[in-house]
């Protein structure tokens, strides 16, 4: 279904409710440059990591968490890349999103979804975690706490994927990056009003960090190896490995 939510001002903060869930896939594809390419790239690195050295002895089979899984797109990409038996757990606090995810992945028997606040979940030991365009919605004070929980729950050599909208620490460059991104959205069919109304709704809801800040945050919780797998202007995909 086409995203037309912001044809007029919602006069409220952005939230992942039923209206958003109905159009969310279209919103993602038209709002995040190279969205599917980043999903496939992230799935490839998790698949390679599992194949090479992360089948941890204490795990009956590899467990992968997708936090803020929304409509389940990343699990589709993972199932296309990974041939071995795996367990996929998607956690999201939006039931409308999870209903969409369950519909899309009903034919996969290795997936389960839980409607919970992932900040309160006690994770099992896992081979991989993903936070794809999610950390930017977590309150800044809670980000380090969440990442430390993830780090402590990762098996040795396990990986964390982090996809984020980012900002530049240089005011002029940041303005230019935002302008280019808005041009991208216009080319995807969004009007000036839609872009402005969505920006208004996301104010103080989506709080981006710079690339440097995100990497420093990952390193602060224990990750010694963090790489940018992909970057387009103000979007990036990071991989962090526990060693």
From Swiss-Prot:
- Is Transferase tagged as a keyword? yes
Q: Domain of life here?
A: Bacteria
**Is Coiled coil one of the keywords UniProt gives this record?**
no
Kindly list the positions annotated as binding S-adenosyl-L-methionine: 35, 68-70, 92-93, 199
Keywords in alphabetical order, please.
S-adenosyl-L-methionine, Transferase
Which GO terms fall under molecular function for this chain's record?
A: carboxyl- or carbamoyltransferase activity; S-adenosyl-L-methionine binding
Catalytic function, reaction form? prephenate + S-adenosyl-L-methionine = carboxy-S-adenosyl-L-methionine + 3-phenylpyruvate + H2O
| InterPro entries reported in the protein's UniProt record | CmoA, Methyltransf_25, SAM-dependent_MTases_sf
The EC designation for this entry is 2.1.3.-
GO process annotations (BP): tRNA wobble uridine modification
Quaternary assembly: Homodimer.
Q: Which family does it belong to?
A: Belongs to the class I-like SAM-binding methyltransferase superfamily. Cx-SAM synthase family.
- Which function does this protein serve? Catalyzes the conversion of S-adenosyl-L-methionine (SAM) to carboxy-S-adenosyl-L-methionine (Cx-SAM).
Q: What is this protein called in UniProt? A: Carboxy-S-adenosyl-L-methionine synthase
Q: Which gene encodes it?
A: cmoA
């Amino acid at each position: 279904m086409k995203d037309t939510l912001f044809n007029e001002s919602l006069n409220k903060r952005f939230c992942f409710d039923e209206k958003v869930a109905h159009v969310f896939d279209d919103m993602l594809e038209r709002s995040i440059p190279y969205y599917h390419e980043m999903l496939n790239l992230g799935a490839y690195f998790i698949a390679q990591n599992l194949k090479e050295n992360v089948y941890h002895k204490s795990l009956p089979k590899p467990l992968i968490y997708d936090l803020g899984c929304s409509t389940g797109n990343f699990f589709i990409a993972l199932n296309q890349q990974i041939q071995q038996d795996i367990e996929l757990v998607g956690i999201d606090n939006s039931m409308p999103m999870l209903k969409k995810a369950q519909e899309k992945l009903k034919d996969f028997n290795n997936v389960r979804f839980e409607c919970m606040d992932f900040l309160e979940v006690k994770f099992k030991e896992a081979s991989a975690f993903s936070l794809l365009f999610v950390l930017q919605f977590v309150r800044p004070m809670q980000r380090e706490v969440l990442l430390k929980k993830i780090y402590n729950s990762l098996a040795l050599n396990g990986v964390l994927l982090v996809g984020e909208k980012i900002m530049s620490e240089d005011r002029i460059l940041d303005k230019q990056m935002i302008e280019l991104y808005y041009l991208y959205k216009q080319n995807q069919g969004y009007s000036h009003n839609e872009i402005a109304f969505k920006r208004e709704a996301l104010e103080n809801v989506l709080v981006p960090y710079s690339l440097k800040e995100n990497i420093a945050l990952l390193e602060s919780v224990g990750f010694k190896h963090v790489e940018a797998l992909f970057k387009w202007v103000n979007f990036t995909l990071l991989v962090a490995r526990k060693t």
